[in-house]
Amino acid sequence: MSEFDSLMQGMSLVLSAHHLGLMVIGVLLGILVGVLPGLGAPNGVALLLPLTFSMSPVSAIILLSCMYWGALFGGSITSILFNIPGEPSSVATTFDGYPMARNGQAGEALTAAFTSALLGALVGVLLLTFLSTHIARFALAFSSPEFFAVYLLAFCTFIGMSRNPPLKTLVAMTIGFAMAAVGMDTVSGDLRLTFDQPWLLSGLSFEVAVIGLFGIGEILCTVEEGLVFRGERARITPMVILRTWARLPRYWLTWLRSALVGCWMGVTPGGPTAASFMSYSLARRFSKNRENFGKGEVEGVIAPETADHSAGTSALLPMLTLGIPGSATAAVMLGGLMIWGLHPGPTLFVEQHDFVWGLIASMYLGNVVSLIVVLATVPLFASILRIPFAIVAPIIVMVCAIGAYSVHNAMLDVVLMLLFGALGYLLKKLGYPIAPLVLAAVLGDKAEDAFRQSMLFSDGQLSVFWSNPLVASLTGAALAMLLWPLLARCAGALFRRGRRSLRHAA
């Protein structure tokens, strides 16, 4: 049976009133989870998982996957309206989404984000539909050196293509690495940066840190600036949506590049967060309007949202074909599959044909349903901007505190949130970028584990990162990204010298 025939069979299974109702419920719950800072898709799916034990596997996976898509969509809402990422992967969306909202373009930013998210997700689903066996064979070749090279590529891309001074970017990234190092060493078992405090044994909570750095830090800066949101700047109408859709086709190359980056990072897996940062950096580097990035450029919203959703969708590919989760949410879903008596791997496509293709079909329909539902809620969420900021600020602080408290149900997390908020405010005042810090905090421990495992495997030989064509190409790409500014300047100087020589010769 061909992929198309299998997909049509899956569509016939999913297109029932019961399953469509589960899609809408899952999307609505996911949007709520994505909007609330600190909760996130993995926690939301984990909380919902026990409720699926009495369902059939197809119904259960439809509910959980649609909650996942809704959370990815919802994470961009608070990122754009309040500069508070609902999801770690939505951090890059704040760079231009929030300035667009402040410039009175909240509707355009949200519409561009949601539409790009749908297109990115569909690319990921197409990859899963038609290239699953080939991608699974490719991902099977990855070991610790390849994983470290992928993370190194993410770090170097952000350093080499950042518009901030490289030294400040490195300092911010170093702080993030230090945050990621707190707790117990996973290799030796030694304690690092715990200062004899038991509550630091498990490390710093990323959710609490990002709520403080972005949420509280932004509130402090905004209060100092005396910002007041004006209602007329957040007017959302169907005409705004249609006008935004009319503009978006001109960014097809950004869409394509970001979708490919997202698929790559989802399958390898680098994750949606790294994919969104890399895509944003690449979009800024190659854009004709790069000077507008950070000031409210719609291309700066399109790139991270496309990559985020293509990576989030592609992350399910290694889970289904190899049993290797490509993201935290995929890991929770993997646990659900095991509980339901399913065993992910190459045989899953044969033994559980209806389940697999029902899931793939629900990915197509679920993302379309997500776009429709979230666009219908745009006026509701955008109307928040009409409320005076003196009223909104305490509400945001309260929501941040609830989100921080919900991570471990501990007041200590609320205190840490406030401390990270002060750090975020200080970094912003001194001109240090927060995004590299967040990237390093998210991927630092994973990169360290991959590096140390590579060193153990190779007896401490760095040549392991050039030991085969795959890891060598990844490492070479990382170094090229790191040295990109220098290479670009040298190439420009040589080009100008050549033009002068030609003029003199003439």
For each of these PLM feature ranges, what is it?
Residues 47, 81-109, 134, 143, ...:
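Flexible loop linkers connecting adjacent transmembrane helices
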Residues 1-60, 133, 139-140, 191-297, ...:
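Helix-loop-helix hairpins and the membrane-proximal interhelical loops
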Residues 41-51, 64, 79-99, 130, ...:
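Re-entrant/interfacial helical elements at transmembrane boundaries that shape
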